[in-house]
Design a protein with these regions (language model features):
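N-terminal, active-site-proximal structural segment of metallo-dependent hydrolase catalytic domains
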Residues: 1-52, 63-68
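Structured beta-strand-rich core segments of catalytic domains in phosphoester-bond hydrolases
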Residues: 39, 47-112
Length: 112
């Protein structure tokens, strides 16, 4: 069975700094972790948050405002395809969707 966790972090940097982020992987061992409201820019992510051993990570950032919205997807298995957005410019520019296609399923991490 595939174990999927979804979490609205309301700020990934703060969540990680408080020590809540990386222990999640050890405790629950999710196959897929979907994060909403990451509120980070690519250059603000520490390596230990971006690169979790045994996981692929994919981030969708807001192009309109720094530190606003954003979603992320961590997967144990490398996806066949990763996609960003839903074809609606306003939402796509806010970094609200990241998805991945696997052999047996597709997962979409998003929020509004």
């Amino acid at each position: 069975m595939t174990k999927i966790i979804s979490w609205n972090t309301n700020g990934l940097r703060a969540t990680a700094k408080q020590g809540y982020f990386t222990p999640l992987f050890k405790k629950y061992k999710p196959d897929v972790l979907c994060l909403q409201e990451t509120k980070v820019e690519p250059d603000q992510l520490p390596d230990d948050v971006r690169n979790i051993k045994g996981y692929e990570s994919y981030f969708s950032y807001s192009k309109l405002r720094k530190g606003y919205s954003g979603v992320a997807l961590y997967t144990k298995e490398k996806p066949l395809e990763v996609f960003y957005g839903m074809g609606i410019k306003k939402f796509d520019d806010e970094g609200r969707i990241v998805g991945a296609k696997f052999k047996d399923y597709t997962i979409i991490c998003g929020y509004y």
